[in-house]
């Protein structure tokens, strides 16, 4: 192939129509560096084929993978779970699946708003209740969908910016893989500004499987 790397790769993917694209992704010390000019990021923005981003981290030596599945209640999350069901053998016989969903820090957000405009304060208990409701909404369809394909997942509630929280958890818990659904983008800018998947791909140390 001759030409701009990202454009040529996306063009070849469209012509060949593979079931999966595997790409190496260099680790970055600064998220902005990945967002600015990354071939990997441009391919994520330009193709609708599942993409596996592989890091320098060695492949797991055992069959018992720890797999995090990031969900947000959308159809894209269900598509990722559907892909897992169709390709279950790729994860091995002893894989441990965790459903990850991040909710905003409702209490901190309300305290900031209250300080700005003298609004009534909200108790931590009320904030906790709201966050749990958001979490249950995000996982309501994902958990039964996983159970339907023979997976009994553990649900993990995270708090904070979704991309940051998921990547932070994956790194802290040393997950072997994170799987997530993502909608396509019509241009690179929208991917940079709007994609949780892009954020996770930038910050997580483990491989990331992104399903369209």
Describe the role of every protein-language-model region.
Residues 1, 52, 98-100, 154-158, ...:
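General small-molecule cofactor/ligand-binding pocket signal
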Residues 1-21, 144-178:
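Structural beta-alpha unit
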Residues 23-42, 62-64, 177-203:
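Glycine-rich, Arg-bearing micro-motifs that act as flexible, cationic patches
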Residues 24, 51-56, 210-212:
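Short beta-strand elements of ligand-binding domains
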Residues 40-58:
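Short, structured interface segments
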Residues 64-122, 144-151:
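Small/aliphatic-rich secondary-structure junction motif
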Residues 120-134:
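A short acidic, glycine-rich active-site loop
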């Amino acid at each position: 192939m001759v030409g701009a790397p990202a454009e040529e790769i996306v063009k070849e993917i469209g012509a060949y129509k593979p079931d999966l694209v595997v790409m190496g992704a260099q680790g970055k010390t600064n998220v902005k560096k990945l967002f600015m000019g990354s071939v990997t990021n441009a391919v994520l923005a330009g193709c609708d084929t599942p993409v596996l981003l592989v890091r320098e981290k060695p492949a797991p030596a055992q069959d018992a993978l720890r797999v995090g599945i990031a969900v947000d209640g959308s159809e894209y999350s269900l598509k990722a779970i559907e892909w897992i069901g169709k390709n279950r053998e790729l994860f091995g016989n002893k894989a441990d699946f965790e459903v990850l969903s991040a909710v905003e820090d409702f209490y901190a957000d309300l305290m900031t708003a209250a300080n700005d405009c003298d609004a009534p304060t909200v108790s931590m208990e009320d904030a906790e209740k709201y966050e749990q409701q958001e979490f249950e909404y995000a996982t309501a369809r994902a958990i039964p969908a996983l159970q339907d394909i023979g997976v009994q997942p553990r649900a993990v509630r995270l708090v904070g910016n979704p991309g940051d929280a998921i990547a932070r958890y994956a790194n802290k818990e040393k997950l072997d893989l994170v799987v997530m659904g993502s909608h396509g983008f019509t241009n690179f800018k929208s991917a940079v500004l709007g994609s949780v998947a892009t954020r996770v791909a930038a910050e997580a140390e483990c491989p990331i499987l992104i399903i369209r």
